[in-house]
């Protein structure tokens, strides 16, 4: 695989979205901002929502929808790498934001569900009817770990539903090509889960005690981050520590790993 570096100096970039003009819009989690990287590598500021913009997607109205973790991480330097660590003491929760790409205007559309504050929204994917799924990563402090959840919401801000709760560090989320299954990854367990859907936003109750149908795990120590699903159904998973992208084919035992010379691969998008 040929790899080229497009831009440097970004503050923990994630959530890339490939635009029609060849640019990439992404978040800088540690910078609290959203940035466009042009084809020649030049950077342009889109918005500065603050907190910790984490996941990003284009909605049906052409706006950016942002999973903002509310500054859920502090950062440490380790072996020349910047690594997310425990939440700072001032972290109070996160939110879902809508951002006008042209003006940079930021609007909070969700920060609670059923009266409970969103902890740290992480990744987001839209379905074909204009609703979106997102993960809430939960948080880690010196007192322990707070579980996360999987949500479904309407883009107009009118309804949000917690579909699964008590998940351990849910991160990447994607939909099967037919839209009948939502896949999500857990970072700390290094597992990929699938949840069959009965209709948009409604999951099937899975027998037993698992939070979905087990869809895969890396054969060794690895953490999972974001994911995308290809047209053929393979779930491409950013695989931390293993240094690459691991492709799972839910419902089969097929697993493929593409090495990348970086131990902390955190996000991916389709483009071109």
Question: Which residues make up each language-model segment?
Answer:
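A short helix->beta-strand "capping" segment at the edge of beta-propeller domains
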Residues: 1-11, 39-41, 110, 207-214
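Beta-rich, blade/repeat-based domains predominating
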Residues: 6-23, 49-80, 90-95, 113-132, ...
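Beta-propeller domains
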Residues: 24-47
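Hydrophobic/aromatic beta-strand positions that recur at structurally equivalent sites within the blades
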Residues: 27, 36-38, 99, 153, ...
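Short, solvent-exposed loop/turn segments at conserved positions within beta-propeller repeat blades
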Residues: 29-30, 74-93, 138-148, 187-189, ...
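A short loop-to-beta-strand structural motif that recurs across blades of beta-propeller domains
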Residues: 33-35, 94-97, 148-151, 191-193, ...
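Beta-propeller blade signature
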Residues: 88-104, 147-156
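Short loop/turn segments immediately following beta-strands, especially the blade-tip
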Residues: 195-205
């Amino acid at each position: 695989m040929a790899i080229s570096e497009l831009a440097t100096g970004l503050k923990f970039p994630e959530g890339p979205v490939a635009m029609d003009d060849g640019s990439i819009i992404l978040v800088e989690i540690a910078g609290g901002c959203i940035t466009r990287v042009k084809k020649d590598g030049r950077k342009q500021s889109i918005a500065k929502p603050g907190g910790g913009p984490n996941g990003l997607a284009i909605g049906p109205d052409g706006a950016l929808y942002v999973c903002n973790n509310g500054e859920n991480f502090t950062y440490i330097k380790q072996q020349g790498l910047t690594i997310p660590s425990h939440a700072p003491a001032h972290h109070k929760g996160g939110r879902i934001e809508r951002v006008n790409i042209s003006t940079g205007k930021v609007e909070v559309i969700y920060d609670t569900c059923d009266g409970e504050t969103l902890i740290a929204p992480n990744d987001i994917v839209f379905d074909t009817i204009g609703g979106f799924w997102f993960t809430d990563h939960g948080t880690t402090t010196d007192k322990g770990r707070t579980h996360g959840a999987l949500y479904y919401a309407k883009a107009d801000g009118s309804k949000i539903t917690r579909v699964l709760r008590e998940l351990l560090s849910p991160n990447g989320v994607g939909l099967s090509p037919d839209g009948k299954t939502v896949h999500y990854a857990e970072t700390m367990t290094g597992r990929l889960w699938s949840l069959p859907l009965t209709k948009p936003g409604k999951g099937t109750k899975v027998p037993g005690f698992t939070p979905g149908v087990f869809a895969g795990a890396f054969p060794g120590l690895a953490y999972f981050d974001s994911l995308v699903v290809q047209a053929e159904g393979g779930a491409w998973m950013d695989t931390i520590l293993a240094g690459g992208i691991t492709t799972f084919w839910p419902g089969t035992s097929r697993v493929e790993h593409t090495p990348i010379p970086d131990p902390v691969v955190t996000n991916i998008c389709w483009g071109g």
